[in-house]
Amino acid sequence: IYSRRWCSEYESTADLVEQACRNALTAAKISPDDIDLLIVATDTPEYISPSTASVVQYRLGLHHAATFDVNTACAGFVAAMDIAVKFIKADEHYNNVLVVGAYAMSKYLQEKDKKTITLFADGAGAAILQSKSELTKGYRQSKMLTKGEYHDWMGIYGGASKFPVNELTLQNKSHQLHFIKKIPPALNTQIWSEMIKEICEREQIQVTDVQHFFFTQININSIYDTMDALGVDRYRAATIMHEYGYTGSACIPMALDQWMKSNRIGEGEYLIFMGSGGGLAFGASLFKM
């Protein structure tokens, strides 16, 4: 990791989400009044309650938009996209859904923990999913998965109903990020490759037909091992952690934004989004440009 970015003392998750949304609206040339739903995927919310999405809806003037937050840890953006697709497919009144992945983990780090302080960073990325009549493009397949037996292996455990804020919680630093046990290194590679194969099989395509892969950016070796296991060239996978650090729910839309701006993605090409995070939560989706 050559560089990473943290919120200032006066910045918070809603600030990151707001700017990402403004960028997405400008790029898509869509008015705030045309957004029907705002979904914010984050495990570092503005508050426990109300939702971060409600704060941003007011700031952006999304006068016609419903809002809610989603917390599936670092798999959040893929989960939020899947929810957005389902809303669009199920209800004709949802035509433009603004989806954001955001991360302000610097607020929860222990300064003396060198394993986390050097890795985690802050950021946000947004995309707009739109209802279209053309059925051969856009969303194709998705799959969600949870391995709940790992729920107590890593996370932020203080400050909610199980361990409310009190003297003991603060003394134990339970309100900050903790890695209780080490996640098996091969687990991501195994589950990522299995889920990707499954959604490609559903679509009746080969994994090698997919031109672009956007993974959770937690470990470049996990990405490379997965690409090797799939028999796909490594260069098809976006890697941005060296430039931005690990940005949780934000890393996949940030990587997508970088590839879109560099004109790497062509019409008719397949994209896979593969997210994973604490819980353990996993989400995979297949789109066609």
Question: What kind of feature is each model-predicted range?
Answer:
Residues 14, 18-21, 25, 44-45, ...:
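Claisen-condensing/thiolase-fold acyl-transfer catalytic domains that form or cleave C-C bonds
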Residues 3, 34-39, 58-71, 106-111, ...:
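Glycine/charged-rich beta-loop-alpha catalytic/anionic-binding loops adjacent to active sites
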Residues 1-10, 113-186, 194, 289:
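Condensing-enzyme catalytic core mediating Claisen C-C bond formation in acyl metabolism
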Residues 81-150, 256-289:
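Conserved beta-strand-centric core segments of catalytic alpha/beta enzyme folds
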Residues 33-41, 207-216:
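Short glycine-rich phosphate-binding loop at a beta-alpha junction
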Residues 47-61, 99-105, 165-169, 222-233:
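Acidic-glycine-rich active-site phosphate/pyrophosphate-binding loop
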Residues 27, 31-62:
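Anion-binding (especially nucleotide phosphate/pyrophosphate-binding) glycine-rich loop
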